[in-house]
Amino acid sequence: MSTHSRPARVAEEFRHGLADVIARGLKDPRVTGFITVTGAKMSPDLKEVTAYVSIHAEDAERERTLEGLKAASTFLQREVARSLRLRHTPHLRFVYDESVARGDRIERLLKEAREKDSHGES
């Protein structure tokens, strides 16, 4: 089986399409902050897609934004499917991707450690 399977290709196209639709803006006032669609995973039967999103905002705002995205999922899946000309519209599910926040935290901790070392602290 190829690493470039149809579900993987469709998931990547869906990710790009979803990012475009979100970038154009949603009317839901809960959707604020900088949103990045970091990945997408399509089920083998192409009936469900999980979109991984990173939201650069404070915790409360991030939760509201994720709620807004989930509330808009039917609209978003329809818009993306229309742009991709898919025969069937996959059910869209959002998951918050913590990897970016974790990476930022690790980078901050490393920077603090380097600063302590440069000042001779232990």
From Swiss-Prot:
PANTHER family: RIBOSOME-BINDING FACTOR A, CHLOROPLASTIC-RELATED. One of several proteins that assist in the late maturation steps of the functional core of the 30S ribosomal subunit. Associates with free 30S ribosomal subunits (but not with 30S subunits that are part of 70S ribosomes or polysomes). Required for efficient processing of 16S rRNA. May interact with the 5'-terminal helix region of 16S rRNA. GO terms for biological process: maturation of SSU-rRNA. Keywords: Cytoplasm, Ribosome biogenesis. It is found in: Cytoplasm. This is Ribosome-binding factor A. The keyword Isomerase does not apply. It comes from the Bacteria. Its main location: cytoplasm. Pfam families: RBFA. GO terms for cellular component: cytosol. One of its GO terms (molecular function) is ribosomal small subunit binding. Belongs to the RbfA family. Signal peptide: none annotated. InterPro entries: KH_dom-like_a/b, RbfA, RbfA_dom_sf, Ribosome-bd_factorA_CS. The keyword Signal does not apply. Monomer. Binds 30S ribosomal subunits, but not 50S ribosomal subunits or 70S ribosomes.
